[in-house]
């Protein structure tokens, strides 16, 4: 029987990135955490869905915490120590994700809310009737 061929794909090299920017996009349905270097190159990312949560549980604060921990762990492996945090969106996982980054061992130097606010742009969605 033939032996399976070894995969020789290009493996991403581990860079030493001491400081970066964490983008937290928190919606009502999911939380996405992307960690970039200062130029905007993505170093690690995670989301509530990628962390194993499905459906309505993706929008919970605990799911946001788990996603932030996973992204922070991968960033720490690449040598990241100091971060700036940019938070976008109205979701429930905003504060929990920031707290999880701090507990993971990253030093937060700045927290900024960059939620886009319309100057009376598009019409809002109709109100839900349950």
UniProtKB/Swiss-Prot annotation:
The keyword Ribosomal protein applies. One of its GO terms (biological process) is translation. InterPro entries: Ribosomal_uS11, Ribosomal_uS11_bac-type, Ribosomal_uS11_CS, Ribosomal_uS11_sf. GO terms for cellular component: ribonucleoprotein complex; ribosome. Keywords: Ribonucleoprotein, Ribosomal protein, RNA-binding, rRNA-binding. SUPFAM superfamilies: Translational machinery components (SSF53137). One of its GO terms (molecular function) is rRNA binding. It comes from the Bacteria. Located on the platform of the 30S subunit, it bridges several disparate RNA helices of the 16S rRNA. Forms part of the Shine-Dalgarno cleft in the 70S ribosome. Part of the 30S ribosomal subunit. Interacts with proteins S7 and S18. Binds to IF-3. Belongs to the universal ribosomal protein uS11 family. HAMAP family: Ribosomal_uS11. This is Small ribosomal subunit protein uS11. It comes from Prochlorococcus marinus (strain SARG / CCMP1375 / SS120).
């Amino acid at each position: 029987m033939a032996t399976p061929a070894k995969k020789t794909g290009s493996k991403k090299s581990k860079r030493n990135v001491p400081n970066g920017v964490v983008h937290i996009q928190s919606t009502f349905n999911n939380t996405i955490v992307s960690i970039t270097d200062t130029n905007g190159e993505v170093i690690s990312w995670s989301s509530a869905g990628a962390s194993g949560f499905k459906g309505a549980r993706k929008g919970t604060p605990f799911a946001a915490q788990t996603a932030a921990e996973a992204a922070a762990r991968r960033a720490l492996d690449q040598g990241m120590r100091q971060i700036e945090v940019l938070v976008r969106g109205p979701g429930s996982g905003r504060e929990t994700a920031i707290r999880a980054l701090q507990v993971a061992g990253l030093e937060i130097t700045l927290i900024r809310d960059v939620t886009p606010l319309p100057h009376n742009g598009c019409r809002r969605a109709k109100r839900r009737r349950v």
